[in-house]
């Protein structure tokens, strides 16, 4: 208690040595308590598609309400592979923590995953990372990544005895590499599109520019060997336009790849950022709006003046015509003779 470590050092301790106290420390650092962190983890697992996972602690020690499945764990592992910093950590077999405020000596951490250790009889040359786990109740569990010929596989085994977690994982990898291949479905350019970006200001849509949406890389799908790419159906979900600020790397659409009843989703991300309206731009819009309003008022007043002038002229004209008509009628009437008495 009271020792200061970097988050990077703590994560290495968790990955290489399953350090329970380090896991609890991270939980409290991120969410304030182990309970809140466990709830956070469960929510994140659901976002990744996990349907049978519930966490109640940060270290994985046995609890009836703390559980997962091999499939759910593979989904979590797949997400980790998307982040290069974690891929790097998971592939390490040794790490040194230098002296700290409470420890005067360097601590040497050695990984427990024997499939990553070239000196172990269980070494698997295509394995690139993973994590071990053990409790009396759960037995040996193992999550491992392996890569060969562009194909990355994730193997998860649970409740194993002795060294079964290594031998079973190796058997799964051998089967996967022998029977499956990573097939290119589309290039980035095949699903690159540009859409307008707008922002609502003063109840009007203001054009902010355009954003290019595309996959982050060429799209691949793992298929049984010999299966053509045309066997995969692709459904796109691309917006016609985007409202509001866009950050580079933001997910704005998806590709849904389907084969044999299974679906894989590929994110379409923003290739460029689009900024919101600046205060200067808003001021210009306000000025333009005010100028337009003044013009409309001026035009309205001008039209009203013209209408009034027309009404005045028409009224005078009608009055003049009436006067002329009365005058003409008086001229046309016969004059009466008057008799005068003498």
Task: Walk through the language-model features, giving the residues of each.
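Active-site-adjacent loops and short helices of periplasmic peptidoglycan-processing enzymes
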Residues: 1-71, 75-84, 88, 148
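Non-catalytic terminal segments and appended small domains
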Residues: 333-335
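Domain-terminus/edge residues, biased toward the C-terminal soluble/receptor-binding domains
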Residues: 50-51, 65-67, 71-304, 312, ...
């Amino acid at each position: 208690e009271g020792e200061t470590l970097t988050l990077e050092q703590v994560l290495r301790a968790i990955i290489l040595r399953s350090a329970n106290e380090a896991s609890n420390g991270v939980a409290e650092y991120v969410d304030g308590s182990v309970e809140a962190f466990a709830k956070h983890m469960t929510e994140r697992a659901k976002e990744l598609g996990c349907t049978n996972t519930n966490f109640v602690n940060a270290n994985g020690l046995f609890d009836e309400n703390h559980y997962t499945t091999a499939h759910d764990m593979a989904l979590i592992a797949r997400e980790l592979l998307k982040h290069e910093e974690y891929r790097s950590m998971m592939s390490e077999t040794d790490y040194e923590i230098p002296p700290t405020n409470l420890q005067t000596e360097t601590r040497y951490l050695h990984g427990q995953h024997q499939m990553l250790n070239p000196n172990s009889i269980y070494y698997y040359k295509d394995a690139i990372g993973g994590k071990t786990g053990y409790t009396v109740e759960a037995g040996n569990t193992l999550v491992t990544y392996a890569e060969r010929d562009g194909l990355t596989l994730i193997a998860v085994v649970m409740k194993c005895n002795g060294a079964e977690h290594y031998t079973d994982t190796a058997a799964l990898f051998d089967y996967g590499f022998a029977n499956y291949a990573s097939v290119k479905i589309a290039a980035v350019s095949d699903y690159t599109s540009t859409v307008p970006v707008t922002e609502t200001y003063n109840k009007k849509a203001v054009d902010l520019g355009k954003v290019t949406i595309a996959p982050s890389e060429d799209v691949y799908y793992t298929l049984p060997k010999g299966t053509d790419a045309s066997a995969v159906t692709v459904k796109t979900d691309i917006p016609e336009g985007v409202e509001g600020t866009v950050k580079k790397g933001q997910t704005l659409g998806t590709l849904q790849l389907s084969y044999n009843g299974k679906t894989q989703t590929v994110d379409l991300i923003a290739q460029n950022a689009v900024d919101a309206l600046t205060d200067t731009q808003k001021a210009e819009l306000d000025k333009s709006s005010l100028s337009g309003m003044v013009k409309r008022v001026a035009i309205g007043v001008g039209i009203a003046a013209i209408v009034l002038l027309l009404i005045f002229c028409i009224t005078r004209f009608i009055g003049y015509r009436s006067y002329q008509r009365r005058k003409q009628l008086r001229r046309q009437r016969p004059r009466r003779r008057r008799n005068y008495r003498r």
